Amino acid sequence: MDGVHPIAEVLSKAAGGDFPTVDGGWQRVEPWRPGVEGVVAFTGRAYLAVDDDVSDGTLVSLGPDGFGGASSPRLVSRLAGSGWIDSLDIVLVARGTGGEPTLVPRSDLRNHPRAEHATAVRSSVTTFGYAAPDDHTLVTLSRGLGGLTEVGVEIDPAKDHVGADLVRDALTLLPEGEVVVAACAPGNARALRAFLAAGFEPVASVQLWRPER
């Protein structure tokens, strides 16, 4: 699509403390990536990115609203059909810090499971890590939610890196002030604490699916 996607716009505003109106409403938007749909929910407001083979009437009949209805498992399952459904994640935002990067490009990590997952739902995925070839700590940067830069991280369990330090190192890969998003499962408390400690702030939830209707 041309221009800034509505999801990118609302997430960028949220990164600056400007959140959608809390009115219980929802808005339909076009998917930001072909073959991937999703729901992004804020406090009292939701956005459904669904392809045009689903009519407005069908969406309304599923009962979405901004107070949790748009993320209803029944609604998501109906829209996904027999397709893959991702977990319901917390969306966190931060800004790039620029500076001298500690991480280096690591094309050898492209087959890492986290990198493969990123490639399945995002675009322009690049992989970074620390320079030591035996260190499989991974950072992915990609075009993710709404076309914004999205970051994912995973520490090599054989190394003693601190999660928050890795996230901070990832932010140096981005120009100072650039909005970056991350999605984290609520049950992944270790990763969630790392993002929070590195300055990310929770602003919304997201659930993605690849529809097979």
Specify the residue positions occupied by each region the protein language model found.
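Short hydrophobic/aromatic beta-strand element in the GNAT-like acyltransferase core
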Residues: 89-91, 125-131, 138
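Conserved active-site alpha-helix within GNAT-family acetyltransferase domains
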Residues: 186-205, 212
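Alpha-helix C-terminal capping segments
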Residues: 121, 129-134, 155, 166-177
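N-terminal charged segments
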Residues: 1-87, 102-124
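Conserved GNAT acetyl-CoA-binding A-motif
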Residues: 46, 174-186, 206
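A conserved beta-strand-loop-helix scaffold within acyl/acetyltransferase catalytic domains
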Residues: 133-149, 156
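Conserved catalytic-core motifs of GNAT/GCN5-like acyltransferases
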Residues: 85-94, 201-213
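Conserved acetyl-CoA-binding loop-helix of GNAT-fold acetyltransferases
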Residues: 151, 159-174, 191-197
